[in-house]
């Protein structure tokens, strides 16, 4: 019970600390996971990488039955992926969770892409790839 209270307090403090940040998060659910989890992507973070043409997307896991909403670095748990919508492959750019600092490695573009597979990957591609021409290029 004390752990649950400590976790709730940590989440509340993290949320309060980032509430004034200029970065807005707009999460859109794209898939159901195992054991009542859900996967969402942040539409405000998505962009097309100028160097590779890949669609870069932040996704987070949530569990509504435990009152855990999707969140970005510092408050949530998730990944940043670079998708090649035409070739249907993906590069994991970074992973994040509250207990570690968020960092995007400079060399992520040189990582070997992996073929997309599984229901969650397919759902992510279906949800975000139609918007590739409507996101900012960075």
Regions found by a protein language model. Name each.
Residues 9, 15, 39-42:
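Residues at secondary-structure transition points
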Residues 1-8:
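Bacterial N-terminal signal peptides that target proteins for export
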């Amino acid at each position: 019970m004390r752990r649950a209270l400590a976790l709730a307090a940590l989440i509340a403090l993290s949320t309060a600390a980032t509430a004034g940040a200029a970065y807005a998060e707009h999460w859109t659910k794209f898939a159901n996971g195992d054991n009542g989890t859900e996967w969402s992507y942040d539409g405000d973070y998505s962009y097309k990488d100028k160097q590779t043409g890949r669609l870069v997307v932040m996704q987070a896991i949530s569990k509504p039955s435990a009152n855990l909403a999707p969140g970005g670095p510092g408050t949530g748990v998730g990944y940043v992926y670079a998708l090649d919508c035409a070739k249907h492959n993906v590069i994991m750019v970074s992973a994040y969770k509250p207990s570690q600092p968020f960092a995007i490695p400079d060399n992520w573009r040189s990582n070997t892409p992996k073929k997309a597979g599984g229901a969650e990957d397919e759902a992510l591609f279906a949800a975000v790839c139609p918007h590739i021409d409507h996101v900012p290029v960075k």
